[in-house]
Amino acid sequence: MEVAGHVLSAEDLEPQKGVLVGLHKNLEDSAFVKLPFDRVARTDGNGRFCIKGVAPGNYRIYALKDMDGDFRYAPGELLAFSRDTIVPRAIADVRRDTLWRDTVHIDTVKLTPITRYAPDDVVLLSFTEKRNSRMLLKTQRDVPEWFRVYFTAPSADVPVIKGLNFDEKDAFLEQRNATGDTLTYWLRPGSLLEQDTLQMAYTYETTDDSTGLAISRTDTLELVPRLTFAKRAKQKAEELEKWEKQREKRHKRGDFSNEQPPKEYLTFGKGLAGTLSPLGNVHFSFSEPPARIDTAAFHLQLKRDSLFEDAPFRLERDSAALLDYTLYAEWRPGQEYELTIDSAAVTGLYGLENRKTTQSIHIPSEDSYGALFLIIPDVDTTAVVELLSGEKTVRRERVNARHGADFFYLNVGTYYVRLFVDANGNGRWDEGCYAEGRQAEEVFYCPMHFDVKANWDIEQTWHARELPRTQQKPKELIKQKEAGKATPKSRNAERAAAKK
């Protein structure tokens, strides 16, 4: 007998090619880890598999990207599992073949007895388990002002630094990245900053190889910057010498316009944009942690006719980031704003100051945007709806109590929609865990696309669970394309072409 179906990625319903799918007669969970499969097959370009030669009985089914070739699951390998018991069976069926007398009239309908095997619609959703094993991966110190420590996984534990050739008290500002697995330590100004080599005992949480439990470990670190103060001073001297030579050439031409020697300023990163959505805000990412911000030196003005008037705003640091700040304001559609930041409005931790910056900000009118209003009856407020432009997430909204998700102020374009059921309420999609018997959080795609036009609202009811997963993801978004099947005729043509 046969068992057939599909393997899709649990995160984006992408067909999984070349994945091993196997059956176990042993129904214990441990069989997937300890025993090789009894019967196996591999998926094709559409993610479809067909396991043949299956004896009658009860089975558990799994999918596995078998990296080590032992037909068993090992941590780090892509997997999929089902709690359903697979019972292969043969079903007597009839195939109808129509014989035509001519192009208009049917001669006979031939009925041919066939045997169909079930189940043939198994859907396995694959994922790679989140890596919980935490190790110190590497350290990095490019410049004297900071050093960075990389881990393989995040931890709520705060590492402890004990200086071996310096006093560690109030010596650093700690910054974590968004995923929590990389820590950056900014050195506070003082004698420590002038010290090329930092020697420390670094105590952190790691995972014991034998038990898999979290333990505390202390490593001795010796950190030397790649670019020392001496090298930096040499570079600046070379830049100044180059500038002075260029100034002499300008003077010979009678050009005295640029008399200010090069100076290093605090930068804002990707910050200021000329056009902003009414739902957007202005983001700053400073080149070093700000030590002082004078909000009185920030001026946001709304243009009325030919005059500007002050507009209220609020400048706040992003929750977990030392460098990132956001300027919030009530952006009115169809209006023009001007943001001016005076020189020295922001002073960095190491004394750098910003230069004066002025940026015009245009807020397009409401009729230049479209809107999309979705009603999704078969999900609740745990669902998070993502609006996609291609595979890029443009916007996300949690389903409200009315089973709706509303997207305002959309730019003209083609959009797709997917949702995931945020079972643990952390606001992001999470993979499953085989040891806990937990599947990855459910993902659904709307099979249609939405062409958003200016000054146009789209209202659509979408039953997320109506179609099987294999029919949900729009073809335009599927990256894995099945190669055309080779036929004897095409092979002969290829051989003939090769001989030429």
Across the structure, where does each feature detected by a protein language model lie?
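N-terminal targeting or signal-anchor segments and their processing/structural boundaries
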Residues: 1-500
